Amino acid sequence: MENPMVSQAEQLEQFRDYLHLLARLQLRSSVQVRADASDIVQQTLVQAIRGLEGFRGKSEAEMAGWLRQILARQLANLVRDQACQKRDISREQSLEAALDESASRVTAFLAGGDSSPSQKAVRNEEVLRLTHALAGLPEAQREAIVLHHLEHRSLAEVSLELDRSTAAVAGLIKRGLRELRVRLQAST
């Protein structure tokens, strides 16, 4: 007989790359926070596993939203701890809103609108496939794509951030997008 907690924990694991991308986007935009996104995602998943019995959602979208809330709390705790301040609920809420915006940017990267529950389910599956495919790219390509397409930075800004020429960044993005297409087609 299958242990339902194991299958739920495995289900949580499929969101690791998605959460990692969201955490990286938030950490990059927060000047005052210097931390590793992988550590924060690990803490988020540990908290989620501990709270699985209390999760009442039924869809992947509800699971993703619940995990974003846990991630927002982890980031708020990190900001609080690093700033040695008392807990600021407005900051936690603004982090949660920023995470929702980051999630929207990832979803918007996949063109199209959601008009039915089945379309939303397909979209959520595509977002997970995209984040898994992004995670498998070489780091330089992944960084260039995230900065340019998800953070909407110009090629010049990305080239400064990555300390590469604009032509080199354009090449990274072109090769990365080509590889993303291959990976996404292979995963269907």
Language model features with spans:
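Short alpha-helix-to-loop micro-motif enriched in aromatics/charged/Gly
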Residues: 52-61
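DNA-recognition helix of helix-turn-helix
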Residues: 130-131, 139-141, 147-150, 155-186
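Amphipathic alpha-helical segment used for protein-protein interaction
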Residues: 19, 100, 104-146, 153, ...
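Arg/Lys-rich amphipathic alpha helix in sigma70-family domain 2
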Residues: 54, 69-94, 98-101, 123
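Hydrophobic/aromatic residues within well-ordered alpha-helical segments
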Residues: 11-19, 67, 71, 137, ...
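Short, charged helix-capping/linker segments at alpha-helix termini
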Residues: 2-14, 21-43, 58, 165-166, ...
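Structural recognition of an alpha-helix C-terminal capping motif at a helix-to-coil junction
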Residues: 35, 39-46, 61-73, 171
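Short amphipathic alpha-helical interface segments enriched in basic and hydrophobic/aromatic residues
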Residues: 20, 24-28, 45-53, 72-84, ...
